[in-house]
Amino acid sequence: CYIQNCPRG
């Protein structure tokens, strides 16, 4: 995931 796109870590 990304720093601004991490719904579940």
Swiss-Prot record:
Query: Taxonomic classification, please?
Result: Eukaryota, Metazoa, Chordata, Craniata, Vertebrata
UniProt keyword Ligase, yes or no: no
* Residues annotated with Glycine amide modification: G9
**Keywords, sorted A to Z:** Amidation, Disulfide bond, Hormone, Secreted
Q: Which InterPro entries match?
A: Neurohypophysial_hormone_CS (IPR022423)
Q: What protein name applies here?
A: Vasotocin
Q: Which PROSITE patterns match?
A: NEUROHYPOPHYS_HORM (PS00264)
Domain of life, per lineage: Eukaryota
- Tell me which family the UniProt entry assigns to this protein: Belongs to the vasopressin/oxytocin family.
Q: Where in the chain are disulfide-linked cysteines found?
A: C1-C6
Location(s), subcellular:
Secreted
Q: A Pfam family name for this chain?
A: Hormone_4
Which Gene Ontology MF annotations are present? neurohypophyseal hormone activity
- Any single GO CC term annotated in Swiss-Prot or TrEMBL for this entry: extracellular region
Q: Summarize the protein's role.
A: Antidiuretic hormone.
